[in-house]
Amino acid sequence: MNRRHARSLILIATASGVLTACSKPDPGMGETRKLIMGTFTEDSVTDRAGKAAAATISNTVPGVYVETWPSKGAYMNIEHLFDGTYDLVIVPAGAAYEAYTGTGACEGEKKEKLRAVAACYPIVSTWISPKKLGLSKVQELKGHPLAVGNEGSETAKVSGEVFDVLGIDKENREIWYYGIQGGADGVRDQWADGIHAFTESPVPAYQELAAEDGIRFLSYTDEELDEILDGHPEYSKIKVPAGTYENQDDEVGTFCEKVLVCVSADMDEDLLHE
């Protein structure tokens, strides 16, 4: 199976999926069925998104109540989905892809019955630089000192993937492994000309800088995005609309990893449709 085809199978987020059912619960429907949704650590963004999704399902699907359970992460969620502990799980598209194809952390353990039924929110690649530099594209960061996320973090991993496509690491002698807030401080203190965040949008540390009107948001070219996505089927193109941040006048062309609600193909078809 090629990667493009696998992407089409795993990234299904239909308008008629579980998050957009519109019927109200009928008190005369009889006994309520409880479903368990695995999320992530208590009060994390993923956990809060799971609770919102669970509330939507509970309030719109007749005879169904969804209870959320914190978990130890995406791969554990997928394991518990198939051992019967969970009925639904929230996982990033990358973990879902690896499980579906039996690659990466799920090497040799295909979960071909994994189905994505809705997308909750995107994890977005967002680069910024000081406004005074006059940059508008990520590729223009070549040769500049950069803060690319804490070593071992998801932001640092994705930064490396971007560098492989753009050739940035070959020309940049100053690559600093600072987290998002540390990188933002680097822009203020003028030792970083660019910082990267691979996280939910808007980024709080960026909001503070944007309010000071001292930064610009950088876009990828369409060709760069095509090359990045070609090697990473878990990613999708996305536009960050103008006005997402204060003093952000232009939309930003970038990519994201969707966080998905997934179920097993063995789930009752009528319930899944609801």
List each model region and its residues:
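Bilobed "Venus flytrap"/periplasmic-binding protein-like clamshell domains
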Residues: T32-T60, V64-E67, P122-D189
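C-terminal motif of bacterial Sec signal peptides marking the signal peptidase cleavage site
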Residues: V18-A21
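Pocket-lining segment of extracytoplasmic ligand-binding domains
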Residues: A93-A95, T103-G104, L133, D169-M267
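Short beta-strand-centered segments that line the small-molecule binding cleft or hinge
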Residues: Y97-G102, E112-Y121
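N-terminal export leaders
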Residues: R3-S8
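Short amphipathic alpha-helical coupling segments at ligand-binding clamshell hinges
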Residues: D268-H273
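Bacterial signal peptide processing site
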Residues: S23-P25
